[in-house]
């Protein structure tokens, strides 16, 4: 298996209204509730629509009323291996740690050399699918 982009977090003022927009405009469905909003899915990707209010956002401390892309997430085979690759490529650790329980969700956050925040996990996100089977070709 390979590392896969499977998560995007967006800071929005009204998660419910934004979720309805994603449903109507893109045909996405709700994958579940988040602590600060709603998880949406297209069947492969997870899009978290979150209202952080006045709470600090990991990697964006000190910024107020942030809207837009907060971070992206990579579903990886091994957090330990990708940690080494991230560090070797110039990335830096922000927060989080790998959990040991099989049914425990976790993510570890990093920054790219330019300061773009992203997270990695081996456990995935609600509504996301790591491996996608290719569609069978129609008979000619």
Model-derived segments and spans:
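Acetyl-CoA-dependent GNAT
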Residues: 52-56, 123-125
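N-terminal beta-strand motif that seeds the catalytic metal site of vicinal oxygen chelate
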Residues: 1-19, 69-74, 123-140
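Core segments of cupin and vicinal oxygen chelate
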Residues: 2, 9-53
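Secondary-structure boundary/capping motif
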Residues: 7, 17-18, 27-28, 71, ...
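A general secondary-structure boundary signal
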Residues: 23, 48, 73-75, 79-80, ...
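Vicinal oxygen chelate
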Residues: 4-13, 41, 60-140, ...
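Short, charged/polar, Gly/Pro-enriched secondary-structure boundary elements
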Residues: 45-49, 56-58, 115-118
């Amino acid at each position: 298996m390979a590392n896969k982009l499977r998560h995007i977090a967006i800071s929005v003022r009204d998660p419910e209204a934004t979720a309805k927009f994603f449903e109507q405009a893109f045909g996405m469905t709700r994958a579940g509730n988040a602590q600060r909003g709603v998880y949406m899915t297209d069947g492969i990707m997870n899009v978290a629509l979150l209202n952080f209010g006045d709470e600090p956002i990991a990697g964006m401390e000190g910024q107020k009323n942030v809207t837009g892309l907060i971070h992206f997430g990579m579903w990886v085979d091994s957090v330990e291996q990708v940690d080494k690759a991230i560090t070797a490529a110039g990335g830096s650790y922000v927060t989080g740690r790998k959990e040991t329980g099989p049914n425990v969700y976790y993510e570890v956050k990093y920054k790219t050399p330019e300061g773009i925040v992203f997270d990695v996990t081996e456990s995935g996100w609600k509504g996301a699918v790591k491996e996608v089977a290719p569609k069978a070709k129609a008979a000619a």
